[in-house]
Amino acid sequence: MAQINKTNIDPYGQIQDMLKAYYPVLYLTTFEYDRAKQKLIGIAKNLNKNFQFYEWNCVDGLGQRDLSDGSITFLENIEEPEQLLKHIASQTEKDDAEIYVLEDFHDFISERNIKIQLRQLAEKLRFYRKHIIIVSSVLSLPVELEKYITVVELPLPGRVDLESSTTV
């Protein structure tokens, strides 16, 4: 398992570089889900590749975020983790650049079918402009997936981050 950010390097700069380098699956550990999603939306906009941005959680299912106005449209019948991964696999036929942010996927990642699907997707997505980003407060990564998923620890915001977010 490649674990990133044990130093003071900007983790969001690292994530942007990883997306440019076609890293297929990232696992971000943080307690600040909204902040992480907002930063990921900013990265998607900065990469200027017309990314389609999707968000999934086990309560709301899969939604597509409009990067221009921030609205989200939920897709029907994609609530279960296996359905979600099958949907992502089916999208490799399309040429669109896509980011899928999965909240709290650690609850499902140890299930046999999920492990196999994630491994297969990690092997497949590296040839496309599609990325899965797991965002969770808990690092729970099965040994079988350690080679395929890059872990990035997102630190709590520092003084500079807090000052810049309060400046209008």
Sequence positions of predicted segments:
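ATP/nucleotide-binding catalytic cores
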Residues: A2-V168
